[in-house]
């Protein structure tokens, strides 16, 4: 019965993946992209065209579907090489933010079945800004936050991941009696995901890479699904640290993950611990 319900939920959710709809930084609200009451209006279909298109702090994504190849440059920010958007096209604006402050990202719906970790990375851009910066696969990214499996000592229906329960109502009705528990964020009351900009960072321009890794099909090779997106910050503050190979674990995208990594090739429906992929979370040096 459980496998039938999971299959139903997964099939129904194929066209119902979520994305970051808006970001709040230093009290300023940023639409990512423009909100629309038209449910067919996916994030890559901004209704404003030409000279009327509003400028963004977020880099464009081509589709609300996943990146499934860990060796693809599209893993970086959700671009689509096939569509001519390598990695992801830089945004024209930067959001002003203070080191040590909290940033809130509000997702749209998210399928209950698509359980997995949520991770956030940063990379320092050139002194001229991020608006023309394409990192390639250089190891410049440092992880600032991650969440994975919150519990693993319960039976499957009570399993708690960082992505459970932002599902649409029709998915919820299928799974409701399985009592999938809600997580600290991504709830039906649309609690945002939050990360904190490291307080020690040297002022400058930074690219933030935020992602969900959905593991519902990850028992098979290339079954993991990656949902990355990027936004651009201009960080101020009194910090002086520039993360480098001497004080942080830096990775590239692609390059940070391996398809055979036990955290990528993983049976999410089985109980047991889960080690979040990628480097250790960067910590500011002790004062």
From Swiss-Prot:
<feature type="binding site">
    <location>
        <position position="227"/>
    </location>
    <ligand>
        <name>Cu(2+)</name>
    </ligand>
</feature>
<keyword id="KW-0325">Glycoprotein</keyword>
<keyword id="KW-0732">Signal</keyword>
<dbReference type="GO" id="GO:0004497">
    <property type="term" value="F:monooxygenase activity"/>
</dbReference>
<protein>
    <recommendedName>
        <fullName>AA9 family lytic polysaccharide monooxygenase C</fullName>
        <ecNumber>1.14.99.56</ecNumber>
    </recommendedName>
</protein>
<keyword id="KW-0624">Polysaccharide degradation</keyword>
<feature type="glycosylation site" description="N-linked (GlcNAc...) asparagine">
    <location>
        <position position="22"/>
    </location>
</feature>
<feature type="binding site">
    <location>
        <position position="17"/>
    </location>
    <ligand>
        <name>Cu(2+)</name>
    </ligand>
</feature>
<comment type="similarity">
    <text>Belongs to the polysaccharide monooxygenase AA9 family.</text>
</comment>
<dbReference type="GO" id="GO:0030245">
    <property type="term" value="P:cellulose catabolic process"/>
</dbReference>
<dbReference type="Pfam" id="PF03443">
    <property type="entry name" value="AA9"/>
</dbReference>
<keyword id="KW-0136">Cellulose degradation</keyword>
<comment type="function">
    <text>Lytic polysaccharide monooxygenase (LPMO) that depolymerizes crystalline and amorphous polysaccharides via the oxidation of scissile alpha- or beta-(1-4)-glycosidic bonds, yielding C1 or C4 oxidation products. Catalysis by LPMOs requires the reduction of the active-site copper from Cu(II) to Cu(I) by a reducing agent and H(2)O(2) or O(2) as a cosubstrate.</text>
</comment>
<feature type="binding site">
    <location>
        <position position="216"/>
    </location>
    <ligand>
        <name>O2</name>
    </ligand>
</feature>
<keyword id="KW-0186">Copper</keyword>
<dbReference type="InterPro" id="IPR005103">
    <property type="entry name" value="AA9_LPMO"/>
</dbReference>
<keyword id="KW-1015">Disulfide bond</keyword>
<feature type="signal peptide">
    <location>
        <begin position="1"/>
        <end position="16"/>
    </location>
</feature>
<keyword id="KW-0479">Metal-binding</keyword>
<feature type="disulfide bond">
    <location>
        <begin position="77"/>
        <end position="230"/>
    </location>
</feature>
<feature type="binding site">
    <location>
        <position position="225"/>
    </location>
    <ligand>
        <name>O2</name>
    </ligand>
</feature>
<dbReference type="InterPro" id="IPR049892">
    <property type="entry name" value="AA9"/>
</dbReference>
<dbReference type="GO" id="GO:0046872">
    <property type="term" value="F:metal ion binding"/>
</dbReference>
<feature type="binding site">
    <location>
        <position position="114"/>
    </location>
    <ligand>
        <name>Cu(2+)</name>
    </ligand>
</feature>
<feature type="disulfide bond">
    <location>
        <begin position="200"/>
        <end position="284"/>
    </location>
</feature>
<keyword id="KW-0503">Monooxygenase</keyword>
<dbReference type="GO" id="GO:0005576">
    <property type="term" value="C:extracellular region"/>
</dbReference>
<keyword id="KW-0964">Secreted</keyword>
<keyword id="KW-0560">Oxidoreductase</keyword>
<keyword id="KW-0119">Carbohydrate metabolism</keyword>
């Amino acid at each position: 019965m459980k496998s039938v319900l999971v299959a139903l939920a997964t099939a129904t959710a194929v066209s119902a993946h979520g994305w970051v709809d808006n970001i709040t930084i230093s009290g300023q609200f940023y639409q990512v992209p423009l909100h629309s009451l038209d449910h067919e209006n996916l994030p890559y279909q901004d209704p404003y065209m030409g000279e009327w298109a509003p400028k963004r702090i977020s880099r464009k994504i081509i589709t609300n579907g996943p990146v499934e190849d860990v060796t693809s440059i599209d893993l970086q920010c959700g671009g689509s090489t096939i569509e001519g958007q390598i990695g992801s096209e830089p945004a024209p604006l930067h959001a002003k933010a203070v080191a040590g402050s909290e940033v809130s990202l509000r997702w749209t719906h998210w399928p209950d079945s698509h359980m997995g970790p949520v991770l956030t990375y940063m990379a320092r851009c050139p002194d001229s800004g991020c608006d023309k910066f394409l990192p390639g696969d250089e190891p410049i990214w440092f992880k600032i936050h991650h969440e994975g499996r919150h519990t693993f000592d319960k039976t499957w229906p009570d399993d708690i991941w960082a992505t459970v329960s932002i599902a649409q109502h029709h998915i919820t009705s299928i799974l409701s009696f399985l009592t999938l528990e809600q997580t600290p964020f991504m709830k039906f009351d649309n609690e945002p995901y939050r990360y904190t900009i490291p307080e020690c960072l040297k002022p400058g321009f930074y690219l933030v890479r935020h992602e969900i890794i959905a593991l519902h099909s990850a028992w098979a090779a290339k079954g993991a699904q990656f949902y990355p997106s990027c936004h651009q910050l201009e960080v101020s503050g009194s910090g002086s640290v520039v993360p480098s190979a001497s004080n942080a674990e830096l990775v590239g995208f692609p390059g940070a993950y391996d398809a055979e990594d036990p955290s990528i090739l993983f049976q999410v429906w089985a109980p047991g611990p889960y080690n979040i992929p990628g480097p250790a979370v960067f910590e500011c040096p002790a004062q």
